[in-house]
From Swiss-Prot:
Listed GO MF terms: DNA binding; methyltransferase activity
Protein name: Probable inactive DNA (cytosine-5)-methyltransferase DRM3
Gene Ontology BP term (one): methylation
Subunit field text: Interacts with Pol V.
Protein's job: Catalytically inactive DNA methyltransferase that acts as regulatory factor for DRM2-mediated DNA methylation. Required for maintenance of non-CpG DNA methylation. Required for normal establishment and maintenance of RNA-directed DNA methylation (RdDM) and accumulation of specific repeat-associated small interfering RNAs (siRNAs). Required for nucleolus organizer region (NOR) nuclear organization during interphase. Acts downstream of the production of siRNAs. May promote RNA polymerase V (Pol V) transcriptional elongation or assist in the stabilization of Pol V transcripts.
Family: Belongs to the class I-like SAM-binding methyltransferase superfamily. DRM-methyltransferase family.
Amino acid sequence: MADMRRRNGSGGSSNHERNEQILFPKPETLDFDLPCDTSFPQQIGDNAASSSGSNVKSLLIEMGFCPTLVQKAIDENGQDDFELLLEILTKSTETEPPGPSFHGLMEPKPEPDIEYETDRIRIALLTMKFPENLVDFALDRLGKDTPIDEMVDFIVAAQLAEKYAEESEDSLDGAEINEEDEDVTPVTARGPEVPNEQLFETMDKTLRLLEMGFSNDEISMAIEKIGTKGQISVLAESIVTGEFPAECHDDLEDIEKKVSAAAPAVNRTCLSKSWRFVGVGAQKEDGGGGSSSGTANIKPDPGIESFPFPATDNVGETSRGKRPKDEDENAYPEEYTGYDDRGKRLRPEDMGDSSSFMETPWMQDEWKDNTYEFPSVMQPRLSQSLGPKVARRPYFFYGQLGELSPSWWSKISGFLFGIHPEHVDTRLCSALRRTEGYLHNLPTVNRFNTLPNPRLTIQDAMPHMRSWWPQWDIRKHFNSGTCSNMKDATLLCERIGRRIAECKGKPTQQDQTLILRHCHTSNLIWIAPNILSPLEPEHLECIMGYPMNHTNIGGGRLAERLKLFDYCFQTDTLGYHLSVLKSMFPQGLTVLSLFSGIGGAEIALDRLGIHLKGVVSVESCGLSRNILKRWWQTSGQTGELVQIEEIKSLTAKRLETLMQRFGGFDFVICQNPSTPLDLSKEISNSEACEFDYTLFNEFARVTKRVRDMM
C-alpha cells in the first residue's frame, strides 16, 4: 500500500481515506444510479450477468484512476484479482508524466467527468448483455447525451441488421467468404467501425418500425418473411395484416422478364399478372429428346401439403386401360350429391368421352411423377396447352370467390377435363385484397387490361382523400370482407375520433398502431382530417370496378347493398382473364351466365369492348336481378337479355329452346358462391366464401348439356 501513498505526491490523508474505503466499503458506494428506463426484460431475461464486474470497475474509478486505464487493465487481466489491478493501475499512473499544476480551488477536471458519464452508460448497456463492440458503436454514433432507451433501440436494430446480413451472405450459392475481408466480417467480429450500407439501411428500417410501436419479434418476423429490401410501408403493412408476400421486393415486370427468358421459345407467351395453379406446356426432358406430353416439372412449394390431381382417376378409362374403382363415388357428402337432367348421378366422366381426356397433358402416365401444389403468392403463371376437344366452343369459365382447399380443387378439376385452376391475387389488378380461383378452357396468351386502367392502391382509387390521409396509415389495399354492420362500424369510428381529439390530432405511436389495426380489420377510410368512416357502396363500386351508383336502386337498403359486394367479381381482375375473347369473337358473343350476381361478368365483357349479342342470366336474388336489368337498359346494350330466377328451371328442353333462339352459346360463366336470397341475414366472411358444391354441380350439369348440344 506504500506505493499507493506515493502515487500523487500529495498528503497521505486522502490516500488513507481511500484505503479506508478499500477495507470497509459502504454498500451504497458499490452502486450507481441509473435512469428508471434502463431495465429492458427482453434484453436481460435469464442472461443478466452479475454486477460484481461493474462494481470492481466503479470502485477503481471512484479511487481516482482514469476510466480508460481501468477498462484497459480489466480487458488485459480480468477482474477477479483486485490487488493485481490496483498494482497495475498504480504503476501506470506513476509512469505518466506530471500534468500542469493548478493551485488553489481552481482545479477543473472536465474530461474525467465526461468519461465517467460515458462509462456509466456503457456499463448499464453491458449489464443488459449487449455485445461490447455494439455498445461502443452506439456510443460513438449517438453520443453520451442520447437517452438510454434510444441506445437500446439502436443496438437492437444493429443486431437485426447483422443477423439478416449474415443470412444473406450464407445464402449465396458458390460464394466463398474470406473471414479476413473487412467488407464481409459481421459487426460483432469488428470494433465500432461503421457497418456497410446494407446494414445501415436495415438498421434504419428497424428503428423506424420500433418508433411506430412494433415489437422486436414482429419486426424480426416481417424482415425474415419479406427480406431486408422490403419497403418500410410494406413491412409495417405485413405486421398489421399478418400477411407476408413471398417476394414483395421483386417487381412484377422483373418476374415476368425472368420467366420469359427462362421459358422455351416455343412456349413463350405474354405472361399475365395472375398466377397459374401449375404450369404446363414446357417440354419435358426424356433422355436426349423432348416428350409431347407437355408436362412441366414444377418444384413443390415447401410448407404446403401436396396432393396429386386425380384427373386420371376421375375419367372413364385411364391411360393403362383400366377403369378406376367406384370408391370415390361416395367421397362427397350426401347433401352434395348432384344429378343430371335425367335424374342420374353426375360423374366426372360425364363431361366428355375418355378420348378427349386422354389428349390433355394431365392424362399421361407422367402425372404420377409430379406433385401439383399451390404455388407461392408470386410464382409466375406458365402457359397451359389443351387438346382441341377441350379448348373449343362453347368456352367455359368457373370462378371461385375466395380461397378453396386443395381437396375441393381436386374434385372440381376432375369434373372439368382435369384442367388445373388459376389462382389470382386481386391486388395485381385492383385495390382489393382477395384470392380468387379460376378454372377455364380459354387461351392464356395475349391478355390485356380493361379500360380505364385499373387503380392498384387505395390512394389511386380515392385520390380526393390523399390530402387528409395520415402518413402513418400505410394501407394500400382493402380486405375482401366488407363491414355490412354499419352500426358497429360507425360506433368504432366515433370512439377512435374521440381518442384522436383527446391527443389534439397527434396520436402516439401506440395509438397509431392500434388505430391502424382497426382500420385494416373494418375497412375504415379517412373522409376528413382525423375523421374515419366505414366504406360506403359508392366506394366499393369504384374499388370493385363497377359503374357509379350501380347498386343504388330502389328497394335496396344500405346494409344489403354492402353485402352484395361479397358475392361479385372484381371486374378488372376478371376482365384481364376474359380479354382473349375479344379477338376470338370480334362480332360479339352470346353468354350463358350462371349465378350472375350484380353482373360482374357482363360488365367486364362490356368494359373490354366486346359486343353482347345475347345474355341468358340465371340469378336467384331479386335485388341482383333488378340491378343487372337496369344496367342493361341504361348502358346502351343492343343485344337481348333473358333473366331466369331458378337454376332448376334450366332443364334440357329449355336449354335447347334457348340455344335455338340464340344460335348456341359461345361462353358459359359461373361464379361461386351465389348471392343469398335473404341479404338481411348476418353471415360471417368465412361463411360467405364457403364452397357450394351443389351450385358447382349445376354448373357442371348445364355446361355438359350445352357442349353435348353443340
